[in-house]
Amino acid sequence: MNKRYFMIIAITIVISSVIAYYYLVHTESIREKEMDETDFLKDKVAVVYYSTTIDTRPGKGFAVFIDQNGEAYPFETKGLELGSSAFNGKTVFFQDETNDYTLSTELKKEKRDKPQFTGDYIGENPKDNSFFSIFNTGFAENGEGYESDIYWKHNQQHKKDTLPFFIETRGQHKNNIYTISGDVTTDEKDGHESYTFALHKTTLSAEAKTVEIMSWNDSDEPLPLSHMHYFNNHLYYLDTVSRKEKSEFRMVDLDLKNKQADDQIIFETALEETDDFLPHSVHKNAHIDKDKFYMIDGKGNVYSTDLRTGSSKKEFHIKTEFQPHDFVEVDWRDHYLYLYFNTTDKSALETYDLTSGERIDRLEIKGVEEILKKNKVYSYDLLILK
């Protein structure tokens, strides 16, 4: 009797496993077929990149495409911590630990030379009508120095090089890729630490050519909070630095012509409240539209700094309330700010007009909560497609 009982249980488990396996494979194959359709991107308004963290093995992730009705279309990947996506108007580019994906009229998958576990930046390579990517690769195998691998295409050939430093922040203008490296020195007498930063410019062709443009010092350790943005021969980015009793949130100004670094305080906060004001996005917390530098903090306040006068002010507050440690992704396009609220209860995509400060659209997303309930993944990037 017991043998029959255990046999029935075993058969039930096998049948259930087969059904579950068939269902998962069948669902995934349908998604891939849909992505191969020529008009898949036609009604898609955004893509959100989800992934497990680097300490989760095996890795898992999703590129979640959202249509104009708020329906979510998840494409499963192997995941990439701090992964992101790029769009050149026709093609979406994203990655996981081992593969590059391009999606336009069809989905193409290309395997890289070695696994990468932490993303850093993805951008368009206008010279070759393709994309490039930078990874936070880690310490060199010989233990000497740090490495950030960069991948690109030249004449349809895959290329790779290594930037021999950890990237503090990065940005792009046309064919130029800008990166900042940092170094710390400690005074042997008083133990005081001082910080030196260097700005590098990389151009991609048959080979990658990287040169140092300028360097500068900072008495305190700043934390970059955004990509760099080019405007009128200057690079601007957001950072924060903690003093004795307060923290400053600053716009850093790198003058490419005169090789000088300056900063402008946007707002200050008490030291113990710093974490509450730290922005939610990993890299997309700042934006330039016309002659204004915009930023958003962790409490939903949007500020602007006039690049002509240097004056800063609070423009408006986000209508939807959220907590400092909620998952909120950010993107910008011209004079619009986009916010993706990412929860297991209800997710939504909101659009704000930077000129008026008004929320002009809210699109509730359907289907994301199932992904979050079944998988321990986190959102790392929002990309607006239209």
Question: Residue locations for each model-derived region?
Answer:
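N-terminal "mature head" segments of proteins
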Residues: 1-131, 143, 385
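Hydrophilic extracytoplasmic domains
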Residues: 18-23, 32-51, 104-105, 255-386
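Repeated scaffold domains used in trafficking and secretory/extracellular systems
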Residues: 29-39, 76-90, 116-129, 161-176, ...
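Short beta-strand elements that form the blades of beta-propeller/WD-repeat-like
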Residues: 39-57, 82-102, 122-144, 170-192, ...
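Hydrophobic/aromatic beta-strand positions that recur at structurally equivalent sites within the blades
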Residues: 61-68, 102-106, 151-153, 200-204, ...
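Short coil/turn linkers that define WD40 beta-propeller blade boundaries
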Residues: 70-71, 108-110, 155-158, 205-207, ...
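Short, surface-exposed coil-to-beta transition loops
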Residues: 145-146, 195, 223, 324-327, ...
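Acidic, serine/threonine- and glycine-rich low-complexity intrinsically disordered segments
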Residues: 163-324
